[in-house]
Amino acid sequence: MIIFKNNEIRFNSILKSILLLLLLFINGNNCKTAQQFLDENFNHALFREHQLEKEYKTKQLVKDDPNMYSDWTEVPAATAEAVTIMRGDDYYYDYDKEQKIEMIVFGSENAISSGSAQNYWYGQTCEATNFNNTPTTTCPNDCHSYWGQGQCNETSSTCICNYFFIGDDCSENVDPQHNWDKMNCNGGRYCPPIYNYPTPRSCVCPPGQAGLECTVCLNNEGCQALTGNYSSSFECNSSPYTYFEKSYSCVVTSAEVNGDLNNSTASASIDCQFPGGNYNTQTGVCSMNLYYRIHGSPLYFNCSFTECDRTILPGQNQSIVCQNSVCNCTTYCGFILDGLISAVTGEATFECGAQTNPDGTSNCLFSQYTINQMLPAIPLQCMSGECIDVATGAPTPPPIYPVPVASMSFLYIYVGSGVGFIGLTLLIGAIFLIFSLQEDRKNFKEDTHLVCELSFHNISCYVNERSGFFGKDVKRKQILDNVNGVCPPGQLTALMGLSGSGKTSLLDILSGRKNVGNIDGKVLINGAPVGKNFKRISGYVTQDDIQIGTLTCREHLMFAALLKLPENMSLEIKQQRVASVLEELGLTRVADNPIGTSEKRGISGGERRRLSIATELIVDPSILFIDEPTSGLDSHSASELITKLKQLANNSTKGQRTIIFSIHQPSAELFEQFDNLILLHQGNPYFSGKREDSVNYFIKQKIAGMTEFEQQNYRMHLKNPADFIISMVTDKNCQRFNSTYVDSRVASPFYQSTSPALSSNSNNSDINLNHHRIINNPHNQNIHHQQHHHHHRHIYGINGPSIDNNDSDSDSDERDHLLASDNINNNNNNNKVKNNDNNNKNNDDDVEDIEEASPIIVVGNQGEPLASHIKIGKVEEYATSFWTQFFVVCRRSLLNYMRNPFLLRTTYFVHIFVGLTLGYLFWKLPANLEPGCQNRFGAMFFMTALLSFGSITSLDLFYNDRIIFIRERANGFYRTSAYFLAKVVTDIIPMRVIPPIILGSICYYMIGLRPGILHFIYFLISLVLTSTVASSMCMAISTISPTFGTANMVSILLLFVFLLFDGFLLARSSIPKYLIGLVWISFMSYGLEIPVVNEFNGLWIEYNPPNTRPTYADGLEFLSTIGANPNRLFTDMYVLLGMIVGYLLLAYVFLRFLVREYR
């Protein structure tokens, strides 16, 4: 044995020298690290040498007699143990118990007290009946002989250790990895494993003691062992209140903390000391050891707290608040977490409930200011014990909290019940109110078809045109100038004129759509001003036929019927109305054909035009406005359409309709079908009256001065009256004939009055046709006139004699037919005329200079007034409720998605493909720093960027359908809010919710992200929220952008800025302070932080740098390096939800107030 010891010393010296030289050669610039590495490897080498020695002895025993140990009867225990380990047997023979012992570890995993558990370890049982391991007189050290770790050599007074332990007292395990985290068992037995078996370490406590470190008393006998005083004056107090020195042994029940420890249930030992039993005055100190496993070792970190005070909370719960905190990590923490734990300062709080659980434990809560920045308050389940010397006086009991528990509970119950009752009452009341309003709407009987006469008086309109680079030059442009007229029901009224004459502007003003420019004048319906309900009794067909091309004609009209017909009308009646309109406009043959898109041809142009008219006829409007109904149609289609319109005006089953339309230069066939004509040129009215009178009016101007033969010849060759009328207006010589006509009109029998009202109003008033307005009002036939003396006029550069007509009969004859507008100053011509007419003998000889004016003469019979004027009853602005409009628009949008599935299919295919690709590239990432953490972070960044940029497709949502929305909203189809909500819902659910879920579901487990259903759900929520925020932002941009290119450019620019400041490409610590606001407004920073925190907060990361022993770091350390806050998981979700609401609200405001057709 002496020879062996000498060889051992020689071997150790040689080995240590070789390792030292090798390390110095490899890393000569870092001697300290090399020395540490040498010490660690030397201990391993020593352990290996110890193994070789045991193996040598075992082989020698087996060599002497191979069959000697087959029945395990005579082999010494130490030798048998060594043989068992070397042979790999599952048991060994214990000679003291004379039985075979299985080499397993078992016991109650959830037991806080290890005193009652039987924990076995490889090679030696921890079960003990005698805990008196005191040194003997011959051996100054214990040698842990009872435990079989060593025995005292009385000759040398030293301990001789067995094969598994070393040290002066044989307390150190031969494997150094099992010594640094050795627990202080306070008289109990510490059970470490041997060799490299990953078995639990724990304290086996003596009778009467319990807890992780055997510091909790179970009874009075335990107090005697703990205090070393075997008198009977010590009593064990198991309440959660701390009097002098209380010990708590706790199990951590926090899922987050245990998740950080690789889902191992952590434990904590807490001790608090106070100098006296006075509960209210003295301050004390506390300490805490946080262990990795439920039964203790290894130690994670420990903390000391000072300036601690005890208080009693409601419910008699105890709270210990300490002002100062100091914490230290063990080597188990890792480098990064060591720095974080060492920085712990500030207040710490330890609270325990007065009520105990059935197993005798209490529910407690530990929180610390610095730790709370990374983790919330840590819930604990603790057993407690304190040994109190009653001989020195009983401690002061804790005070009673002022508010009794029962009273507080009843107060909560009363308040909660009251609030709940009030809330329930309000909810029921709101539901009842909404239901009542809906029933009132459904039961409301609207008026039948209204026969309406439309009249307009003194309609003028001008706009300010800006020019120049900066638009500073403003020029006023006259669009309409004092236009008057009457449109009777049952007739076609045509607004005719060349392009730019003001036809569409007048049509827009009459229909209430004109929203640009300054407008003067009055528009009356049956003598009453136009109200908000005008949309319900009128329809407007624009020049452009814009419909959803994927729908059929019947579907298009059915959606219009569902939106514009009353809700009390049954679905069957609405379907009959659709079929009737289709038949009325000759669309039955193509009723089930698609309308057609730019990619796929559908119905013809004429059929589309008739479909646009049919859309407005669904509600049987009293007044129908049509802008250029024959535009783009051939002569046959145009004639057929005008014929249909004439039938609709005069042959309605519910009453006559008033139809007003604009037209350029119709054919003779079309012109003959008009009932009334309003002629405009350059904004000025030239005629307003019956269509047949217009031809005679302009012919008499044309043939004035011709011989009778020339007049007959001219009438014979007149082919198209419309062409003739337009040519008369544009002819430079027209004013010469107009002047002649005005001079001779009094004697013409064509202008004899047929109105008794006007005839009875005959008087001797003088009328100047150029300076006065005679309005044929169908309701009172009042004539406004004024006498002017010695007025002269200049017509397009032609001077004519002034008119001084004193014949009252002539005046009365003309009042029924002439509609003259006021004299308007022409600012473009400043010629002034001085006319000395010697024939005006009844007037003064004074001569007045006047500004040049156009001859505004509007002539014709405006039709007899209605015998009885039908008043417009109570008609609501919209025929259907908000929810009806919402569901109908939702259904139409979804149907459009199904009929045009390319975008939907492409989106789903891309997300499935990307999910599989990411799963393949990042397959089962390991839980290490590189590539595990790097690739996890990269995969999350890629998904965030993909979903954000993929949401640019939302730009089409409101931009492509903008014209349809403007037209339908203007026609009273729906509210802006109902349309907006329907479009948002039908876009977000199929395009922003389902695709991210598909993407995340495919790649989550393929990548190997954190297991657990909650973590998976949080991950999907982050993807959905990110996609929805990006989509909402694009919606807001598209609603306000004038062009699609502008919306696209702004969206991409913002997405790139947000991508740069999301925390992946640019570290937050390196962002300048004046740009840090971009981080807070970047939705990607929140969208990326959620999955990162969800993944790394609780992930145990292996750090394995080259040439060093691998260590483990908490995921919190990684989060701190990238600037992520682990406590912002739910806060980030709330922020993203707020951004969604904010962007959508902004988009709605833009859509409601800024998106409109400027006419």
From Swiss-Prot:
Region (Disordered): 752-846
Lineage: Eukaryota, Amoebozoa, Evosea, Eumycetozoa, Dictyostelia
Domain ABC transporter: 454-707
GO biological process, one term: culmination involved in sorocarp development
Annotated transmembrane regions: 11-31, 415-435, 909-929, 937-957, 1005-1025, 1047-1067, 1074-1094, 1135-1155
GO CC annotations on file: membrane
Family stated for the protein in its record: Belongs to the ABC transporter superfamily. ABCG family. Eye pigment precursor importer (TC 3.A.1.204) subfamily.
SMART domains, sorted: AAA (SM00382)
Domain ABC transmembrane type-2 residues, every copy: 902-1154
Protein name: ABC transporter G family member 24
Gene3D superfamilies in alphabetical order: P-loop containing nucleotide triphosphate hydrolases
